[in-house]
Amino acid sequence: MTRVKRGYVARKRRKNILTLTSGFQGTHSKLFRTANQQGMRALASSHRDRGKRKRNLRRLWITRVNAAARDNGISYNKLIEYLYKKKILLNRKILAQIAILDKFCFSTIIKNIITE
């Protein structure tokens, strides 16, 4: 069987890892073994935090809608209940944007929901 030389493949693999970790501090961007560990850790953290970001944004939207709803004399819980009863399809992100950017429109929505 002929000999297979793997110098190029190994060098390319290490170069890819070191390129991934090029912005890291100290030996985490210079030495392959520590760079490899930190690269895997960074990818795991970014994967975990993408899910965490979604949860945090939903909490922020709910907080904003709750504050705006209480300014109009209704709790967040009742507002969502009335929206479901009237079959109005506004999600929390859109409600939060309306509450911040157009307070008059938000109060109009609440008045229409409550009165009917």
Swiss-Prot record:
Keyword rRNA-binding attached: yes
Primary location: plastid
Entry keywords, A to Z: Chloroplast, Plastid, Ribonucleoprotein, Ribosomal protein, RNA-binding, rRNA-binding
Subcellular location per the Swiss-Prot or TrEMBL entry: Plastid, Chloroplast
Matching Pfam families: Ribosomal_L20
The keyword RNA-binding is annotated on this UniProt entry: yes
GO molecular function: rRNA binding; structural constituent of ribosome
Lineage top rank: taxon: Eukaryota
Gene Ontology BP terms: ribosomal large subunit assembly; translation
CC annotations in GO: chloroplast; ribonucleoprotein complex; ribosome
Function: Binds directly to 23S ribosomal RNA and is necessary for the in vitro assembly process of the 50S ribosomal subunit. It is not involved in the protein synthesizing functions of that subunit.
NCBIfam families named in the record: rplT_bact (TIGR01032)
HAMAP family associated with the record: Ribosomal_bL20
UniProt similarity note: Belongs to the bacterial ribosomal protein bL20 family.
Name by which UniProt lists this protein: Large ribosomal subunit protein bL20c
Organism, scientific name: Marchantia polymorpha (Common liverwort)
Gene designation: rpl20
